[in-house]
């Protein structure tokens, strides 16, 4: 087993990479932020402010050819994820791709084929599965704490009507579902371990080719599911798992530590509520470390591309129906 740090390269100098994932790579045990590829030296200098040894590659291709890069993180606009993910794999680099991995499930299928051909790890940067709040929710449902599951519902919203923001640009894969729908859909699938049987309904509001609000319902084996996403509403994020014996509520389930404190509330039939509070954990650091253990020690990664594909199938159905 190789014990040397995983040397990471980032394709692009996206603001999220500079403020969140870059610092997470730098802080993670067994990881090193080695290089950033960008045409802008000024943007790369923003990474050097916290990772002094980071090198500047002037093109994505140059970074992928770098023999001193062990893994690649891709925070590019959504419509570029799969193409550059495949190029990274073909260059012999394991790759962590920002969510959503693809524009549709057929794109993810191409990426899965490239992953299998390369024999390397490729995964979606889906950080919530590395947070103890979500891991605890999955365990509590599995051990029967709330009894047989009958319904799941979720909500994720924030307000952003800036036409210049990538979330509001159709050509690059903008819209609320791709940005935050992955969480209310994928989170339900992660905790329950199930895939939906069918789409029951979808109502989608559109502005300039991007979905700004979506309300959706799915039927699963033994339980129903409802959620909404909005990028034109005041901030809200919650997940609820309704069982025959109790209700499990996850507060601040998607931006723990930023939006609010991560808690898990268990409401039981005797009218008691048990609250579990989770310490502040950087789920992005946890994600980087888990990816490193997967490629260095062969540990199973919690969110493989097949999981991303399952969420994308749900998203594709809502977008098509709406």
Q: Model-predicted segments: where are they?
A:
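Rossmann-fold dehydrogenase core element
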Residues: 109-127, 148-150
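Contiguous beta-strand/loop segments that form the cofactor/metal-binding neighborhood of enzyme cores
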Residues: 185-257, 288-299
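Active-site loop of classical SDR/Rossmann-like NAD(P)-dependent oxidoreductases
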Residues: 16, 258, 276-289
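Hydrophobic residues in well-ordered beta-strands that form the structural core
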Residues: 17, 58, 97-98, 122-124, ...
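Predominantly a Rossmann-like dinucleotide-binding segment in NAD(P)-dependent oxidoreductases
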Residues: 128-200, 207
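Beta-loop-alpha module in the N-terminal Rossmann-like domain of NAD(P)-dependent dehydrogenases
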Residues: 54-114
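C-terminal helix-rich "cap/oligomerization" subdomain common to oxidoreductases
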Residues: 1-5, 71-73, 290-322
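N-terminal Rossmann-like dinucleotide-binding module
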Residues: 1-51
């Amino acid at each position: 087993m190789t014990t040397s740090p995983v040397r990471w390269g980032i394709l692009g100098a996206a603001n999220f990479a500079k403020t969140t994932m870059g610092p997470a790579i730098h802080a993670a045990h067994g990881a090193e932020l080695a290089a950033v590829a960008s045409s802008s030296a000024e943007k790369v200098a923003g990474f050097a402010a916290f990772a002094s040894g980071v090198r500047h590659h002037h093109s994505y291709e140059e970074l992928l050819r770098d023999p001193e890069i062990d893994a690649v993180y891709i925070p590019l606009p959504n419509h570029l994820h799969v193409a550059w993910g495949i190029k990274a794999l073909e260059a012999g680099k394991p790759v962590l791709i920002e969510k959503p991995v693809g524009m549709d499930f057929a794109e993810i299928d191409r990426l899965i084929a490239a992953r299998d051909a390369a024999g390397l790890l490729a995964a979606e940067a889906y950080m919530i599965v590395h947070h103890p709040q979500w891991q605890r929710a999955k365990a509590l449902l599995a051990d029967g704490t709330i009894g047989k599951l009958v319904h799941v519902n979720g909500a994720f919203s924030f307000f952003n009507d800036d036409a210049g923001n990538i979330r509001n640009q159709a050509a690059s894969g903008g819209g609320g579902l791709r940005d935050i729908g992955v969480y209310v859909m994928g989170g339900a699938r992660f905790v329950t371990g199930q895939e939906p049987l069918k789409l029951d309904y979808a109502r989608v509001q559109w502005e300039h080719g991007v979905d700004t609000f979506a309300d959706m319902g799915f039927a699963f084996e033994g339980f129903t599911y409802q959620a909404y996403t909005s990028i034109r509403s005041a901030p809200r994020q919650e997940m609820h798992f309704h069982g025959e014996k109790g209700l499990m509520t996850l507060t601040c389930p998607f931006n723990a530590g930023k939006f609010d404190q991560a808690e898990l509330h268990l409401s039981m039939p005797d009218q008691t509520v048990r609250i579990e509070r989770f310490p502040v954990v950087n789920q992005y650091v946890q994600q980087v470390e888990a990816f490193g253990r997967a490629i260095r020690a062969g540990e199973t990664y919690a969110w493989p591309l097949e999981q991303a594909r399952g969420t994308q199938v749900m998203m594709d159905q809502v977008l098509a129906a709406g």
